[in-house]
Regions:
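Long, low-complexity, charged/polar intrinsically disordered regions in eukaryotic proteins
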Residues: 1-28
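Short helix-coil-helix linker/hinge
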Residues: 33-39
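Hydrophobic residues on short alpha-helical segments
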Residues: 43-44
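Short acidic, hydrophobic short linear motifs in intrinsically disordered regions
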Residues: 48-60
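Short amphipathic alpha-helical interaction segments
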Residues: 60-76
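A short, conserved structural fragment
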Residues: 75-86
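Short, amphipathic alpha-helical interaction segments positioned at domain boundaries
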Residues: 88-125
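Catalytic cores of enzyme domains
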Residues: 125-217
Length: 217
């Protein structure tokens, strides 16, 4: 019988950026740090598209109240993304990167950081290069194409920020991880922005704080 964590690894490998296996099984160690077996079982049945707990419960033939509590717990642990709209809440499964790993801010310890660094250096960092279908590839169309992609000036970035209703800033998860394994750098750490519902998620999970438009500038 296939181990639940092997099934979870395979599921994550089907999502964005993959989650490849290694001989050392460091990827399984990471999953055991992140998920209980019960959480892994539920994650396997969730969609990467936002769903209401009532819809998930109906699809899985489970009690709404019990399932809602588990979905919320998994969102707090960074397994799922949570989006609120008034009294309505929806959840979706997220990949390891970008997703579960970034959501470990405030939760990761040295052991997790060392396992992640080992995994990134030996396998995960090579996933894009190992895809059977290249991420970037040339497709001949036998006709001239006009490319007009201007580089956005600084003023455009300011305009994007000014148009946001909710902005959060959080520590850089990469620099946080490096610090835990003894490779702290001298660059600022609190410099990652999130906007809208993602800003709400970061603040609600204790990973970041809301800032004003002027502070973001």
């Amino acid at each position: 019988m296939t181990d639940i964590y092997e099934k979870l690894r395979a599921r994550l490998d089907d999502l964005a950026n993959g989650y490849p296996a290694t001989e050392s099984k460091v990827e399984i160690r990471l999953l055991k740090r992140l998920f209980t077996e019960e959480e892994a079982e539920l994650y396997l049945q969730l969609s990467p598209f936002l769903e209401k707990p009532q819809d998930v419960a109906k699809r899985l033939n489970r009690e709404v109240e019990e399932l809602s509590a588990m979905l919320e717990r998994m969102a707090q642990k960074g397994h799922l993304f949570r989006k609120r709209n008034g009294d309505q809440v929806r959840y979706s499964a997220v990949p390891y990167v970008v997703g579960i790993f970034e959501h470990q801010l405030g939760r990761m310890d040295e052991g997790f950081a060392r396992d992640h660094e080992e995994y990134f250096e030996t396998a995960f960092g090579q996933t894009i290069q190992s895809f059977k279908t290249p991420v970037l590839r040339t497709i001949p169309v036998n006709r001239q194409m006009v490319a007009d992609y201007p580089v956005a000036p600084f003023e455009d970035v300011l305009q994007i920020i000014e148009n946001q209703k909710k902005i959060a800033v959080a520590p850089c998860v990469c620099r946080t991880t490096k610090k835990l394994v003894g490779h702290e750098c001298d660059k600022p750490v609190e410099n990652c922005f999130s906007f809208g519902s993602h800003a709400e998620y970061y603040v609600e999970n204790g990973m970041g704080r809301f800032i004003t438009i002027d502070e973001a500038k």
